Amino acid sequence: MKNPLWGGRFTTSSSDIMKKINESISFDKTLYEEDIAGSIAHCKMLVNQRIISKYEGQLIIHGLEVIQNQISSGTFEFSTDLEDIHMNIEHNLKKMVGNIAGKLHTARSRNDQVATDFKLWIRKSIVKIEHYLHELQDTIINLAESHYNTIMPGFTHLQIAQPVTLGHHLMAYFEMFKRDFSRWQDLYKRMNQCPLGSAALAGTSFPIDRHFVAQELGFYSPTENSIDAVSDRDYAIEFLSNASICIMHLSRLAEEIILWCSYNFKFITLSDNITTGSSIMPQKKNPDAAELIRGKTGRIFASLNQILVVMKGLPLAYSKDMQEDKEALFDATNNLMLCIEAMNNMLSNIIINKNNMLKAAEHDYSTATDLADWLVKNLNLSFREAHETTGQIVKLAEHNQCKLHELTLEQIKTIIPSINDTVFSVLSVENSVASRTSYGGTAPTNVIEAIKKGKAYLSNIKFSQTDKNNI
């Protein structure tokens, strides 16, 4: 049987292998709500413009609503012979209303149809991701507030560097996710133009009203160029770029969770409901959720790379290669939302082992920078001189197998005779942390202010939206 929608100039039907490689219904049926919403808006416009009759429009819209209910309830039968979601819906619409169904495709192509569907789906997904991120940020800021003065080691090169507060460390991730949130908002604004009415690539000679359709579907405006509208997927690439940055931030936090719950750190304890055991080692409690977030990061990165490679060599306008844009994006979206939710679950039930964090912060001469700063402020040394002198004092402590504050004044004077006993005030991790009051620093007073600002931000946040986000 020849294809009922495009088989007019063909004398034979597609081979089985052609049908197999050509079909996309196995994955683009995900777009059924968006496809039907776009078709209803297009149908209303055709009626308004008197391209089809009001009666025909009513029949078509009723049929589309019936099909939507069938798909939602699981009673609709998809066919790979009909290639994609568009043709499956139109074929079944024809069964209901007859040849009138064919009038729905007046002044449109599957090229602008799928671009519209895809934008609607991405737009809806952006709003979902924003809500997931908002919940995660709320969990992070509440945890930071509970530990605004909990001292832990700060690291560079995964070596203990300087003492910081856990609250400050957590607020670093809050800021990362805040920027992620703004990227989703920016994308929503940039992509929210409607391709429908661009037809195959050149527009149409029918007297359509693209502004009506755009408004009906909640877009800010129609796209400005019909070729651009059907031939680019930069919004999908940007979506996956945002997803990649966001999952990268999640992966870094997941990596720290994995480290922190290990025997070597013992900074945290994860809840039983977000960990797993071993089939052979009864004592194991594995941070599998964190590891899977870290692992799924590569999967999302690959999705971005996939669509970049698909698009990089395509001449204008549409090519069938672009059918390969959806599976990767659907997969990345589902996994990103799952990972955000899993991270939120982990942090909501985490136990912080404060004493272990404090003890670790006191190791590896973490207040050496404070000592160097004291030498600059009190003995008028240049920072380079103070750095050299402090290094010698650290070496002395290593030789004596003690911490900096355990050295005697007499021992330190063998390095720098002009030093006095007030230096010991800066060698405790508590004083070190309290002194870091520069804007954005780790002092508990700063963390409290950062949390206040963060809470105000969360309470005033505006999610990307139109009055059609349910489409």
Curated annotation (Swiss-Prot):
What's the EC number here?
Answer: 4.3.2.1
Keywords in alphabetical order: Amino-acid biosynthesis, Arginine biosynthesis, Cytoplasm, Lyase
Biological process GO terms, please? arginine biosynthetic process via ornithine; L-arginine biosynthetic process
List the PROSITE patterns. FUMARATE_LYASES
Give the pathway.
Amino-acid biosynthesis; L-arginine biosynthesis; L-arginine from L-ornithine and carbamoyl phosphate: step 3/3
At the top level, the lineage of the source is Bacteria
Chain ranges passing through the membrane = none
Localisation per UniProt entry = Cytoplasm
Q: Record's Pfam families?
A: ASL_C2, Lyase_1
The principal localisation class reads cytoplasm
Catalytic activity, as annotated? 2-(N(omega)-L-arginino)succinate = fumarate + L-arginine
User: GO molecular-function annotation terms?
Assistant: argininosuccinate lyase activity
Q: What class of enzyme is it?
A: lyase
Question: GO cellular-component terms in the record?
Answer: cytosol
| Gene3D superfamilies listed in its UniProt record | Fumarase/aspartase (C-terminal domain) (1.10.40.30), Fumarase/aspartase (Central domain) (1.20.200.10), Fumarase/aspartase (N-terminal domain) (1.10.275.10)
Coiled-coil zones: none
Family, according to the entry, reads as follows: Belongs to the lyase 1 family. Argininosuccinate lyase subfamily.
What name appears for this protein in its UniProt entry?
Answer: Argininosuccinate lyase
Q: Which organism is it from?
A: Ehrlichia canis (strain Jake)
